[in-house]
């Protein structure tokens, strides 16, 4: 017999403990215990392609240019979609675990993996023709050839993501972050050895770098799969209910599509930024500097992503359990962590603004330009961290559609036009483009803050219950 969705009286449980009675301190500890390992896991996953790019780059400028172009194209057309779709499981699996509907977690996870596979097939077809597509778009034929060859060998990585990402959310929803951490770090060490072997020892160049990513991600997928299959920690949650499969697929796409829109709209904006920088007066300088700023911002962003994943998990768990007040305190705890980390890294970046550019370039002009943009980059650190946490709240509650609409308004109706106007009409060049990003992030932050502050948490818990019941009854 199944566990009840909510307590016996079917009423939302009022939480007597609030931030006044120390609940905030308790939540800070719980969110931190999830956030730190998840941030580390995200960094480890981010470093896999970075290491391959670094190793391939030592084989010449052509190899580096081709790999960089392929990385950009595959991120936009494939990996962003995979990362976005799996955001639905933060809602579904997290709330199911909180409601003690453990068998639903396995069904949701297997449904997500099954749904991802045909999407990967469609994306793979696009990647197969990447070389011809890039040439038709006016890219250099030699660079396009390297990029196309690299993308072909990344196709297995795409299918590995179809397994890794749902299993990651499956474990995260249960708070099983330490196994994730161990497997991610092991995979990173494994990747370094494989990448060196294929690229340097066997002399496979950029193709070897791409193959190394594929081998490493499949290693990660297999280790996670074995843990989920054989670990006693997943005994209750790995079960599959076949009659719920179709309804779970519908639920996956219902929340996955707007979740993917949330992420893709943000990723695509930065690719648009780089494209626009190539149209400025000094395209080599502007593109180099904006690429450095984007890389720096991305490296920092993995930390707020870890906090957001933790907040999303706590919020979804507590809404599923019918304890909305604790979910609310989890949001406050996440914002406290955001304030500390964004302040620390912003101060650190500003203090070293005159030398950070040397980590990427020996050009004094580039280094000085990066230093000039550092105050804006510091502001991006603050805003990106804030929006990351609140986007985590959105995924935990299940209102990804609001997040997607917010990104359209903030980035494409406000941020991008402002950036293009400042860059070209006001001749602020790269600084103008980044100002547009900051303005867009500010609008996004304001809208998310208003929505979160006005949220009826008891109503969100009731919606979580209805979501689970509709899934049980085979409704989407």
Curated annotation (Swiss-Prot):
Keyword Transmembrane helix recorded: yes
Subcellular compartments: Membrane
InterPro entries recorded: MATE_euk (IPR045069), MATE_fam (IPR002528)
GO cellular component: membrane
GO molecular function: antiporter activity; xenobiotic transmembrane transporter activity
Positions of transmembrane segments: 35-55, 66-86, 117-137, 154-174, 176-196, 208-228, 260-280, 289-309, 332-352, 370-390, 408-428, 433-453
Membrane topology term: Multi-pass membrane protein
Keywords linked to the UniProt accession: Membrane, Transmembrane, Transmembrane helix, Transport
Keyword Transferase: no
CDD domains hit by this protein: MATE_eukaryotic
Main localization category: membrane
GO biological process: xenobiotic detoxification by transmembrane export across the plasma membrane
Family of this protein: Belongs to the multi antimicrobial extrusion (MATE) (TC 2.A.66.1) family.
Protein name: Protein DETOXIFICATION 4
Highest classification ranks of the organism: Eukaryota, Viridiplantae, Streptophyta, Embryophyta, Tracheophyta
Encoding gene, per UniProt annotation: DTX4
